[in-house]
């Protein structure tokens, strides 16, 4: 009786684990919910809230500083919604053990609660035609503004905590260049966005340069953003800092597709330095009272 032939393992048997798709930590709603129910639901609700806010802007005509008072709530709802959903997406690159750590609450529950607290205050002030930021007219207004500032710090701190968690608990097999871009973007959001926000909150307004002939009325701002064209605007560097967590991962995703890993990683480092310098330059320009487009 002849012996049974020995079955040799095929390459498929010894194949390395499939690398997770670069830039995709699960694209279904169920996947995002598994990463963070708080962030996913919170981000979606924040974006959906733009619909009733827009309706309010049509039904309740309220002006503030030359523009519709509901422009600011709409912009913040868009920005905060994207921020929360980005955190939910990036948490998908953590191992289950990383997401289960107690400190991970700072990237989940805490920023969601802080975002809705800040949004409620901004919307309430808008409905009254009053300033939400820089409003220290009364002791109550000063206290509420300070509380909103604490919430804003908790929001940007969440990005730094997530960057630290991705350093220690990133999913195995993740492309190194893309992972580097995630961490760089999150750190820059916390540092640049946080520093610009702290400086901005200590001023009497976002516009600089009125004494140099600039116009601080927001009615003369750029389309969509509302940034001043005649005076400088401290919101520009704050915007760049806060959104580093979207720009750099997008660059890292592209770099990991175009170049070999060592070159892609080096390009991500270079992009992070360039982005930081651009943000610092925008801050120096704004603080000096020079318009973003030099008055064009």
What does each model-identified segment do?
Residues 1-35:
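Short, Lys/Arg-rich, polar N-terminal cytosolic tail immediately upstream
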Residues 38-58, 70-93, 108-126, 147-164, ...:
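Hydrophobic cores of alpha-helical transmembrane segments in multi-pass integral membrane proteins
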Residues 64-73, 134-147, 175-180, 294-296:
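Non-cytosolic membrane-interface motifs at loop->transmembrane helix junctions
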Residues 90-103:
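Membrane-helix interface/capping segments
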Residues 176-183, 261-270:
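Membrane-interfacial entry segments at the cytosolic side of transmembrane helices
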Residues 177-212:
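Aromatic-rich transmembrane-lumenal/periplasmic boundary elements in polytopic membrane proteins
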Residues 201-244:
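Membrane-interfacial catalytic/cofactor-binding modules of polytopic membrane enzymes
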Residues 284-296:
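Juxtamembrane boundary at the C-terminal end of a transmembrane helix
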